[in-house]
Regions:
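Non-heme di-metal
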Residues: 1-320
Length: 320
């Protein structure tokens, strides 16, 4: 009989990177509900109104990008999969992007009033810089070639997020908002894998192109990065001028733009290196998460639930 639909066989791996990425992503699975965000309320109350406004806006911007990535971005990459295991990896990535987007709402519900949350989302959905970068990336997702879509995704994952990530990492380095920053570190850990994996898949396709097409795509890629960086400069100035961090954030952005290019197998564009980035922020960007005492659940790492034996009555839900 002719095969209508094929079952995925994880014992016949075509690309070992698919398997290793799947294992990495599933090993580091997490949910925002396991982070004790309310422990940051004392720190939050001590921040100035200007700082609170900044935190709300950067997380609003990050929510927008993660929403787009979970709804449009990963779906756009599926059309060019090489193996069934790659599709499984994208399923995981798409779900975790939704977890990331939801995590910011958990932060808002802990730190902000209902009115403040509404203001944050109104600002997010109307900010010209945010809407511009969403439009640039999403138009590529909708109309670009398979390789162009991968470039857009890596630029989003490894570059555009970092204007927002700077704030919680800076506070973490100053011993503030440690649990909020723990969520950001978990997100960064995921995005690091996403960017590397999608960049690897890009390189497979790029290396199959004739040299002339490679040069044309490289020119397009660097032009896109310039366009995104120019918009990101304006976004950064609008957010950070009030607290005096603008130039430090721009340095951080340029450093991560180079990392995005490296994920794509390309040469760096900017002269900035890790040595140029604020060391407090670089220390926070480590993709390890904080330690915690499992038995007493002390600390700001990922908390596991207490284990209890099941009893007969536990199976009676909905039957009373």
């Amino acid at each position: 009989m002719e095969t209508y639909y094929k079952a995925i066989n994880w014992n016949a791996i075509e690309d070992v990177i698919d398997k290793s990425t799947w294992e990495k992503l599933t090993e580091q699975f997490w949910l925002d509900t396991r982070i004790p965000l309310s422990n940051d309320l004392d720190d939050w109350r001590k921040l100035s109104n200007k700082e609170k406004d900044l935190v709300g806006k950067v997380f609003g911007g990050l929510t927008l990008l993660d929403t787009m990535q979970s709804e449009t971005g990963v779906q756009a990459l599926r059309a060019d999969i090489r193996t069934p295991h790659e599709e499984a990896v994208f399923n995981n990535i798409q779900f975790m992007e939704s977890v990331h987007a939801k995590s910011y709402s958990s932060i808002f519900s802990t730190l902000n009033t209902k009115a403040e949350i509404e203001e944050i989302f109104e600002w997010t959905n109307t900010n010209p810089y945010l809407q511009r970068k969403a439009e640039i990336i999403n138009e590529i997702y909708l109309n670009g070639s398979p390789l162009e879509k991968k470039v857009a995704s890596v630029f989003l994952e490894t570059f555009l997020f970092y204007s927002g990530f700077f704030t919680p990492l800076y506070y973490l380095g100053n011993n503030k908002l440690a649990n909020v920053a723990e969520i950001i570190k978990l997100i960064i850990r995921d995005e690091s894998v996403h960017g590397t994996y999608i960049g690897y898949k890009f390189q497979l396709g790029f290396n199959e192109l004739p040299e002339e097409e490679q040069e044309k795509l490289k020119e397009w890629m660097y032009d896109l990065l310039y366009t995104l960086y120019e918009n990101e400069e304006g976004y950064t100035e609008s957010l950070y001028d009030g607290v005096g961090w603008t130039e430090e954030v721009k340095t951080f952005l340029r450093y991560n733009a180079n990392k995005a290019l490296m994920n794509l197998g390309q040469d760096p564009l900017f002269p900035d290196s890790a040595d140029d980035v604020n060391p407090i922020v670089m220390n926070g960007i480590s993709t390890g998460t904080s330690n915690h005492d499992f038995f007493s659940q002390v600390g700001n790492g990922y908390l596991l639930g207490e284990v209890e034996a099941m009893q007969d009555k536990d199976y009676n839900y909905g039957l009373d």
